[in-house]
Amino acid sequence: MVTIKDFCAEMKSGATPSRSNPEYWSNGTIPWLKSGEVHNNVIHHTEEHITGEALSECSTKLLPYGTILMAMYGVTAGEVGYLGLPATTNQAICGMICKNKSDASWLFFTLLAFQKDISSQATGGAQSNLSKEFIERIHILRPQRNCSDLEKILHHIETNSAEINKLKTLQDLLLAKISSR
């Protein structure tokens, strides 16, 4: 058994650049993820984007492809995501950067398997939450061998979810064309 903190190379939580500064949001190209977008899924796109200025001037951090995410607050507390692109996040998400893709696959599926147990330990009044420190202390089994089978499964999930996103975009375009006739 090992803690998630010891299993991961690095753990980070994000931040929200000031919404009152349009230079942080207007024409942004850097994906910025809200905890409501973390739904036990592979994430290929985000609803919002920030600018390079926001990234350099605020405390949000660019997380690499393959980072494992856990929503920490509210209804989505305990839900897990796998970053299918480099992205930044808000402060309600804990990013877990693994040493390699095999470890990331293992951690993603382990957290999915224990998600209900983890989310049931969220504390708080009106809005339950998990702290980054709590997540760091979660104990998991360390894999005893290469997890290449899990990597293959995760690759299929990534491919399928990217295809689903493309199909949703096409569906939206077709519906817009049909309704404009």
Question: Where in this protein do the model-derived segments appear?
Answer:
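Sequence-specific dsDNA recognition surfaces
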Residues: 5-23, 36-65, 84, 89
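Non-catalytic DNA-recognition/assembly elements of restriction-modification systems
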Residues: 1-15, 27, 137, 141-181
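Short helix/loop capping segments that flank catalytic or ligand/cofactor-binding pockets
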Residues: 41-43, 80, 105
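ATP-grasp fold ATP-binding core
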Residues: 33
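A short glycine-rich beta-alpha junction/loop motif
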Residues: 73, 87-94, 124-147
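Short, positively charged
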Residues: 99-138
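Short, charged beta-turn/beta-strand-edge "cap" motif at the junction between a beta-strand
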Residues: 75-78
